[in-house]
């Protein structure tokens, strides 16, 4: 029986790796947020999502974060976003999710 559990666990891990690889091909960056043994997967939000979040949220950073997180979620138990402590934890990581490449601008 233990052998069967190991095989199904291995299959689940392989399935998860394949799904993540598919997401990376489609979206580029993929992030995993793990809390209490549960995982949530996010893509880096695109400009349309960030623009819409700015319009909807205006001066409310929590609404902004909620919109971006819900619209960037790829997989996992979405009901975790309703847990305030999970939401607050993710909100503290928004800069990482919405990271930018910084280059150098030269006056020629």
Name the predicted role of every residue range.
Residues 12-13, 17, 32, 77-78:
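Alpha-helical interaction segments
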Residues 2-3, 27, 34-108:
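Short, surface-exposed, charged amphipathic helix/loop patches that serve as local interaction elements
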Residues 23, 32-33:
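A general structural signal for short secondary-structure junctions and capping/turn motifs
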